[in-house]
Amino acid sequence: MKPMLKDFSNLLLVVLCDYVLGEAEYLLLQEPVHVALSDRTVSVGFHYLSDVNGTLRNVSVMLWEANTNRTLTTKYLLTNQAQGTLQFECFYFKEAGDYWFVMIPEVTDNGTQVPLWEKSAFLKVEWPVFHIDLNRTAKAAEGTFQVGVFTTQPLCLFPVDKPDMLVDVIFTDRLPEARASLGQPLEIRASKRTKLTQGQWVEFGCAPVGVEAYVTVMLRLLGQDSVIASTGPIDLAQKFGYKLMMAPEVTCESVLEVMVLPPPCVFVQGVLAVYKEAPKRPEERTFQVAENRLPLGERRTVFNCTLFDVGKNKYCFNFGIVKKGHFSAKECMLIQRNIETWGPWQPWSPCSTTCGDAVRERRRLCVTSFPSRPSCSGMSSETSPCSLEECAVFRPPGPSPVSPQDPVKSNNVVTVTGISLCLFIIFATVLITLWRRFGRAPKCSTPVRHNSIHSPGFRKNSDEENICELSEPRGSFSDAGDGPRGSPGDTGIPLTYRCSASAPPEDEASGSESFQSNAQKIIPPLFSYRLAQQQLKEMKKKGLTETTKVYHVSQSPLTDTVVDATASPPLDLECPEEAAASKFRIKSPFLDQPGAGTGERPPSRLDGIVPPPGCAVSPSQTLIQKSQIRSTGGRDGSSERCHSRSSLFRRTASFHETKQSRPFRERSLSALTPRQVPAYSSRMRTWDQMEDRCRPPSRSTHLLPERPEHFQGAGRTSSPLGPLSKSYTVGHPRRKPDPGDRQAGLVAGAEKMEPHRAHRGPSPSHRSASRKQSSPIFLKDSYQKVSQLSPSHFRKDKCQSFPIHPEFAFYDNTSFRLTEAEQRMLDLPGYFGSNEEDETTSTLSVEKLVI
């Protein structure tokens, strides 16, 4: 066995040596695969052995294309070159296919070449990779599109016969799988020749395929059937899709236009719907605002602006193809809607002329959200002719017709004249009023008393008259006087409750004679005088010599009425404030002269002061004032105030200012009540000594007494009375002042008054003796005859009952003449009584009217 293996090994070694050392011929390709049209060359390696004699023969390498069965080129080897590499350029490889490299040796005997197929090389050539794309053109409305051809392979630079490319496009209306069921498909081909480049866009026009269009693109070399690259079929609707042409934000004025941009080569046919912005929460449901259908080939549609809400809101538009039933386009936008519309027409204006051809005009306003820049479309005004009467053909000769402005001018003149006349009347009225108020010197001053009930507006009472001389201004018959000032609290205090500021405490001793020294002659108002005359006549008819009447007193003294006789509630002798006084009081027509100081007043004491020289009046109006001055310890020592009473009061002053609960007064013709006796201070003077006429009272005259010695008496006390004291100061009686001392007594000051009498005497003459007596507890009331003269003698005095000036002619001295019996009956002085035993009841004061 071993010898057999040894022999076989030797045989293999001989064969191997023969192969290695023997002759070998071959062709070798570096790259078996090549890219057509590329810029790379093909390299082929060869090895060829010479013959036995060592001579070289001619050898060539042939490039043969198998697809076309033709030789493309042949290259020869050098004679003395047994091995090497041959280069084949890129332009030999224009198409993809199979290529062969074959070595062909030369035969020596006859010179023919026989290819050695056993000694050949195979080359595979492929097409380069081209990318095809479709795109919209700038003229999308024209129905065109673009085909792009791109490759990343570097192409060969053909020196001659550079090949061209051919781009073929095939349009169809359906996909290949649907052709059998729907019949013969519609195909439209379009080709374009182009140069061989690495990338380019080739534009094609659209074929009228329909709503659906499919495109297939193929790339070939010109003149060849082989396809370099192809793509398709491509659904253009899916490739490009539908687009809605609209701005992101638009202001809707009248209508909103929306344009649908379809894919290239596709006709529009579908539904365009409008939805409000999608809700933010999923549970909310969107609602459709409107929907418009687009017919075949129509790309534009409009929506009315009234469909959208006022303001800025977001809406979405969806377009869908009818066949597919789904929306393939959606766009959202902000729509601003403003209110811009025309308002109603205004009425027609009047015709421009009164005759002939005329026109009229009417206007309307633009209602808009932006009044500063209204943009309503249309005319804001319009005109129309007016059909009026024909104008007169023949006109009378004369001046030119008046222009339409002349009536307006005449109307203006009338208006200006009327206004001027009205202004003149107003101006004249103002001047007359000012002249009446400031142009004349006032006959009498008009002092007022604050908080007056009968004159709340500080006016002169209706029943007051001026009794002063023409050359001397006097104070008005008001409720307040111009006398000396008292304390600030004295203003507004009733007349009968004002304390004397000039009387010292020791003057209480002279209270017994204060009855005669405090008489006052006054003139009654007209209504009171006539009322007295009427009462006297009634008494005469009834045969009465004495009677009592109670009158209801209103704020207007002219409306006093008679009521049944009644008892009056007691007076408040604690000096109440004016605000608590009764509104049914009657105010004095003369000036009140409050005292210079205040003091404390015991209850059931009445105060008064001596009056200054006043107007001379008739003795028929003389009233007897019974007064008594209380002692004062200091001006600010007590919280309760007593106020001095002025001597210049009217005859109705006996109706005291009382509380509001006393709306009635009692009036008597023969007797007086005991508690409300006002202190009159002017009776002490006689008519014989009053030769001078009345003079205006001076404020400075009554401020301080001229003769202080008259206020000093034997019974002077050193301590003042307390505010709640019930005791009375004991005074000594004074003598009755004679007529010579009367003037000094008037200026001296106030005298103290005695307390009220406990009973009434038959006459003032009988009471005068008892009044001069004094008591350790209180002074006895007494009366004294006031005057030595009879009323007839007083009437003869030159100072009449009424002023003789023509201004006072209304007071007729002869209108109130009485009979002799009435004269004798009424020739009694008034007197005041007092009843201190009954402190709870009292009647309103009454007065005696002496004619």
From Swiss-Prot:
Query: For this UniProt entry, which residues form the secretion signal?
Result: 1-24
- Write out the entry's keywords from A to Z: Cell junction, Disulfide bond, Endosome, Glycoprotein, Membrane, Phosphoprotein, Signal, Transmembrane, Transmembrane helix
The record lists glycosylation at 53, 58, 69, 110, 135, 304
Can you say where in the cell this protein is located? Endosome membrane; Cell junction, Focal adhesion
Here the segments flagged for biased composition (Polar residues) are 765-776
Every copy of the TSP type-1 domain together lies at 339-392
Swiss-Prot/TrEMBL GO biological process terms? focal adhesion assembly; hematopoietic progenitor cell differentiation
Q: Where are the transmembrane segments?
A: 413-433
Where composition is biased (Basic and acidic residues), the residues are: 685-695
Q: Name one Pfam family in it.
A: THSD1_D2
Phenotype upon knockout? Answer: Some animals develop hydrocephalus as early as 8 weeks after birth. A few die spontaneously at 9 weeks and have diffuse cerebral hemorrhage not seen in wild-type littermates.
Disulfide bond sites = 351-386, 355-391, 366-376
How this chain assembles, per its entry, is:
Part of a complex composed of THSD1, PTK2/FAK1, TLN1 and VCL. Interacts with TLN1.
Protein name, per record: Thrombospondin type-1 domain-containing protein 1
